[in-house]
Design a protein with these regions (language model features):
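N-terminal beta-strand motif that seeds the catalytic metal site of vicinal oxygen chelate
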Residues: 1-28, 87-94, 147-150
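Short glycine/proline-centered loop/turn elements that form peptide/ligand docking sites
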Residues: 25-26, 43-49
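Vicinal oxygen chelate
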Residues: 2-8, 21-34, 38, 43, 53-55, 63-65, 71-133, ...
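An N-terminus-focused feature that recognizes amino-terminal "leader" regions
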Residues: 14, 33, 49-52
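Short, conserved turn/kink motifs that form compact alpha/beta structural patches or helix kinks used as
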Residues: 67-69
Length: 150
């Protein structure tokens, strides 16, 4: 297989951190003291049930996503519970040019996809998630989000 056969993964889109309910604003303020700027805020409903804040530092796509669960049914709330209630690293996100091609390619390669098809994400994106223990040959050990802008 050549590089031309692999759908274009462009760059890291963001790193996500799960924060406990009530900790979002103190963390946003702390990152602002370090020079980060808030560039997006949204309550993401549906499957995700989180409050999202995107922070940027410097120029370019240097984004940190803070995720606060809106309720106990949120996947982020369950992730925080599994970590002993501490919160912390949630996932990395990779930007692609064509989400459907990336989805089809990863499915063909045997990756365990957590979504049956690409779906609407926050800020007008289309996304799907890849399981941390995805194939017999590959176990990332952490969740991966694949993102297409607009």
């Amino acid at each position: 297989m050549s590089a031309a056969d692999i759908p274009g993964f462009l760059f890291f889109d963001h790193v996500a951190v799960a924060v406990r309910q009530g900790d979002l604003e103190p963390q946003v303020n702390a990152y602002k003291l370090l020079g980060f700027t808030e560039v997006h805020r949204e309550d993401v409903l549906g499957k995700d049930q989180v409050r999202e804040v995107l922070l940027q530092i410097g120029a370019g796509p240097n984004l940190l996503q803070l995720l606060e669960p809106l309720n106990a049914d949120s996947p982020v709330a369950k992730q925080i519970e599994k970590s002993g209630g501490r919160g912390g690293f949630a996932h990395i996100a990779l930007r692609v040019a064509d989400i459907q091609k990336a989805f089809d390619y990863m499915k063909e390669q045997g990756f365990k996809l957590l979504d049956p098809a690409p779906r609407k994400g926050s800020r007008g994106t289309t996304v799907f998630f890849v399981h941390p223990k995805t194939t017999e040959q590959v176990a990332f050990g952490y969740l991966i989000e694949v993102v297409q802008e607009g």
